[in-house]
């Protein structure tokens, strides 16, 4: 069991803690959050510092995961991922034992796959993504870096979701379309055609 530090102490952090505890591969040494929250606890784990303390934390702990959520903008998660890489942290994929990931699929570094998510054969998921509870990534789909595939959403076969896209809860996509980078797909929507980058679709 290796030590790991979590970066971000909000609601998404709680979900990731639950996955890490279920996975039983890592020992959480603490959480990094804003300076005013130092000393507070999240599900019993202490907030031990802010971003400014990460280099010092790295001396004794080499693993980290971004636990800031991603509602619409990917920028906070993207910035923290880059900062952690720059310091030298290893960012393992965190995968719930209750998720199903085909042996013919791939999941990038720093990505978190939540309980009861499914990633089917031939699918490729990029770095620093959230594949949230009960999300389905179908065969041969590609999810870019820094994407959030939200709860109970369906990315159908062969779909390409480009980098930094937010795919909302219970949204679905037609098979074999391309969703351009930095798009926002609102909860409950059906995407039936390819979209240019920075698209915004709402129900």
Segments predicted by a language model, with ranges:
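Residues at the starts of beta-strands that form the adenosine-phosphate
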Residues: 3, 27-29, 63, 90
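NAD(P)-binding Rossmann-fold cofactor-contacting core
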Residues: 23-41
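Short, solvent-exposed amphipathic alpha-helical segments in soluble enzyme
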Residues: 20-23, 81-83
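Phosphate-bearing ligand-interacting subdomains
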Residues: 38-96, 100
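Glycine-rich adenosine-cofactor-binding loop
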Residues: 2-20
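Alpha-helical elements of the RecA-like P-loop NTPase motor core of helicases
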Residues: 14-18, 75-78, 145, 193
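Structural signal for interior beta-strand "rungs" in well-ordered beta-sheet cores
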Residues: 93-203
